[in-house]
Design a protein with these regions (language model features):
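A short glycine-rich, Lys/Arg-flanked "PGG" loop and its adjoining helix->strand segment in the class I
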Residues: 6-25
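Conserved class I S-adenosyl-L-methionine
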Residues: 25-50
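Catalytic activation segment of kinase domains across protein kinase-like and atypical kinase folds
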Residues: 46-59, 276-330
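Short alpha-helix
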Residues: 61-87
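ATP-binding glycine-rich loop module of kinase domains
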Residues: 158-210
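Conserved structural core of kinase catalytic domains
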Residues: 219-268
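C-lobe/activation-segment region of protein kinase-like
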Residues: 297-390
Length: 391
């Protein structure tokens, strides 16, 4: 109705394109009508009704969102040939991560799916598990919750993750860039001036960890500090391979406890090398280790401190974080872990309390998006619970 034409979306885009300067870009941020969250029980954003987009707006109305194919049909109708799709996650309203066709999410990455700040939602299934299957079948571009589309020239940046729910001195973003020759680089960039020293500290951590693990069986991803025209950032190699957490997940999915134990024992042996050296990477979680055949590399060592931390504490923390990320990992025999590491129940309690203190250290007075949703967001309605109650 706003455009007063039979094809208002095409007319609106054509009008915008006429205002572009040479080399200009149009940026479109929009919901995906087939976003997974709408299947899982989120309401349509504009109408506040369930399944309206999925049902192709059968009840009418002037509001529309589109699938990727739907957007591409509009572009073709307007003569647009150069465009690039990005995928804000969880969605474009409260994005923490931005993916692209050149860098799609891996299995296990899409776990922060509750963002219903404005209204109640149903919870019909676990979106993380559904996303895992979608990622495996290469369907993420179909079921991503939102799209950001760049009409015009693209960017070297193929992936961005914002770590901004922290104290200001630790707020950074992580980018993966790919140049015209296809060479990928990882960058860590401060989001504010207060975080400059944190970026500089990663280059120091790289050198210190190299010294600690010299002669051992684990590598450190190379870090280079850059300072130009008042800007500070770190660059890292982009390593191919598989995360240790992925390999461990495969073992649990196959009920291969022995395979998991072998990987864990190797983790303890490799990361525990030279334990008396006064440098420790406190965040030696399984997802921060890349495995390429027999080569293991620590790819993220942001939280490295100039002191020795007991290897069993670091290993326990890695397991603790691993279990918190996915309830399906509860198949892991935690008693075996405690026995292997020589950790008592009292030790475990102390380590959990230390983890809470560490999280407070990182976040300062800030709350994560998940914590904010828990405090001020809408309710979660679980029809599956009602079905069981009234059967």
């Amino acid at each position: 109705s706003y455009m007063g034409t039979e094809k208002p979306y095409e007319a609106f885009l054509s009008m915008i394109l006429r205002h572009l300067a040479p080399g200009g870009r149009v940026v479109i941020a929009i919901e995906n009508k087939y976003g997974l969250k709408y299947f899982a029980g989120c309401r349509e954003d504009h109408l506040g009704t369930w399944f309206s987009g999925i049902e192709n707006y059968a009840d009418g109305g002037g509001v529309r969102t589109f699938s990727r194919k739907g957007l591409e049909r509009i572009f073709a109708s307007c003569g647009v040939k150069k465009y690039h799709f990005y995928y804000p996650y969880p969605d474009y309203k409260f994005m923490t991560t931005l993916y692209s066709d050149a860098y799609l999410p891996g299995k296990g990455e899409l776990s922060n799916n509750l963002r219903n700040f404005d209204r109640d939602r149903m919870l019909l299934f676990d979106e993380k598990h559904a996303f895992d299957g979608i990622v495996e079948d290469n369907l993420f571009s179909v079921f991503a919750n939102s799209y950001t589309v760049i009409i015009g020239d693209g960017f070297d940046i193929k992936y961005v993750k914002y770590s901004n729910d922290r104290a200001k001195e630790y707020q950074i973003r992580t980018e993966i860039c790919r140049d015209a020759d296809g060479i990928a680089t990882v960058k860590k960039i401060p989001l504010c001036e207060e975080a400059n020293e944190h970026i500089r500290g990663m280059a120091v951590a790289y050198r210190n960890l190299l010294e600690r693990y010299e002669g051992g069986r684990i590598g450190i991803n190379r870090c280079t500090l850059h300072e130009e025209n008042g800007r500070v950032w770190d660059s890292f190699e982009f390593l191919e391979g598989r995360l240790l957490s992925e390999l461990m997940d495969e073992c649990l999915e196959k009920q291969d406890q022995e395979g998991f134990r072998r990987l864990f024992a190797e983790y303890v042996e490799r990361t525990g090398y030279n334990p008396d050296y006064p440098v420790s990477d406190f965040d030696l979680i399984f997802g921060n280790i890349m495995v390429q055949g027999d080569d293991w590399t620590i790819i993220d060592y942001e939280w490295t401190f100039g002191k020795d931390v007991d290897a069993k504490e670091l290993a326990f923390r890695a397991v603790y974080c691993y279990l918190l990320e996915d309830e399906r990992r509860n198949a892991l025999d935690l008693d075996w872990i405690l026995e292997t590491l020589g950790i008592t129940e009292q030790d475990a309690k102390q380590y959990r309390e230390q983890e809470m203190d560490f999280q407070k250290f990182v976040t300062g007075q800030r709350l994560s998006m998940a914590q904010l949703r828990d405090r001020i967001g809408g309710d979660l309605l679980k029809p599956t619970d009602w079905v069981q109650r009234f059967r």
